[in-house]
């Protein structure tokens, strides 16, 4: 149904300010030197390395297939979902509009603020009042792995903070959907 575009490292905003991703945070915890290398790429001091890792390519494709199967499942159950096109410039605004409209699920939600950016796999509407109405949203990250890693928790926590800025209330839960189950944190 949809092919994911990867925005994994920091970038510059139109105002020449560096915007970080959840991956940058996780990478920095594991290797501060990688942060410096990525910074040099953003500043134009180094070329972005080209990755030809076929194993990672296969895993990425399997992940996309898993997300697509979840979308098909949602559609078969009659849920109203909204897909954000990652190639659109106004993905953040479309995400906020979908939240205000009360879509049951939002796929590839563009979440960003002045310092952080990312694409949440899914947002799910829940029965918790917010400035959106009688509902609010929580993040769902899809993972093929049966174990949740620290980087995943950092990612969904960061996305939850950005969601709170939009809806005026911090999500009660964060979720990770695996092929076997949905884990709620």
How does the language model describe each region?
Residues 2-5, 183-185:
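Short, intrinsically disordered, charge-balanced linker/junction segments flanking boundaries
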Residues 7-132:
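Metal-dependent nuclease catalytic cores that hydrolyze phosphodiester bonds in DNA/RNA
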Residues 111-185:
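Nucleic-acid nuclease catalytic cores
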